[in-house]
Amino acid sequence: MRHQKRTHKLGRDTQHRSALIANLAKELIEHKRIKTTLIKAKALRPFAEKLITLAKKGTLHARRLVVRKIHSKKAARLLFKEIAPQMQGRIGGYVRIYKMGNRLSDGAKMALIEWTEGQVPVENQKAQKAE
């Protein structure tokens, strides 16, 4: 039985899974919103929230830890300069996941994952495009 097992294995070994999560986090930081499978989004959420918690500290040590986790100085710079200041008033829940239905090719459940602060919600964007 898999009681109290918190990790999503995603059908990959440990190094592949950690590289996948780091790359997804880097893309989320750079693009502010990404479309991926629901399970990958659920696996990414705690990783991304821990990155924001580190970035809100703003120390040199926190910056080095973030760079070590996501392997990108550019993304770390964006995280510290743009995203973390928007989240200063928020205690947790930095990431929002929208379910988007199934992918046509293989039927995988898809999701949209984005930052909660500083974003125009998906429904409002559709309404703006219609006008």
Swiss-Prot record:
Pfam families: Ribosomal_L17. HAMAP family: Ribosomal_bL17. GO terms for molecular function: structural constituent of ribosome. One of its GO terms (biological process) is translation. The keyword Ribonucleoprotein applies. This is Large ribosomal subunit protein bL17. Coiled coil: none annotated. PROSITE patterns: RIBOSOMAL_L17 (PS01167). It comes from the Bacteria. Keywords: Ribonucleoprotein, Ribosomal protein. The lineage of its organism: Bacteria, Pseudomonadati, Verrucomicrobiota, Methylacidiphilae, Methylacidiphilales. One of its GO terms (cellular component) is cytosolic large ribosomal subunit. Part of the 50S ribosomal subunit. Contacts protein L32. Belongs to the bacterial ribosomal protein bL17 family.
